[in-house]
Amino acid sequence: REILAGLIGSDSRIQFSETMPGEANAIYHLIDAAGLEGMVSKRRDSKYRSGPTTNWLKTKSFTESEFELLGVERERGKPAFALMAEPGTRKYVGSAFVSVNREMRERLWKRVQEHAGPPPKEMPKRPATQWVKPGIKARVKHLRGEEDLRHASLQDFWDDE
């Protein structure tokens, strides 16, 4: 631990925290409440080994944000994705898995077909995408602390009134 602390400079993007002994769930809730990206925890007696292990765990924090729906990408045999943009700008920020229940998924497909529109000018061609006109907002769960959407899933959607 001392060697690692010495390798990380004070101007580094990497933050080195002090040891926080205690119950992992309680510590995670404090980290999540503070708006941090997550935590790395390890068994006190374990040594670092490269590759997957249960001795070292990375626990990530998620948040929910509101975005504008640009379109839905659907290909046979693959999961569907909602293509999302910053609200009001139509600037693409990433995609979110469409992992909602069947009723909501069918309502989404219907809404997408009713609001079909051209792709945003800056977007590369995506043949499997049904683009929509501006006006559909969505709530997306995604990793906290990332510029673009990562590990994102669509939670809900509605017409922007």
PLM segments and residue spans:
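Catalytic cores of nucleic-acid ligases and guanylyltransferases
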Residues: R1-E161
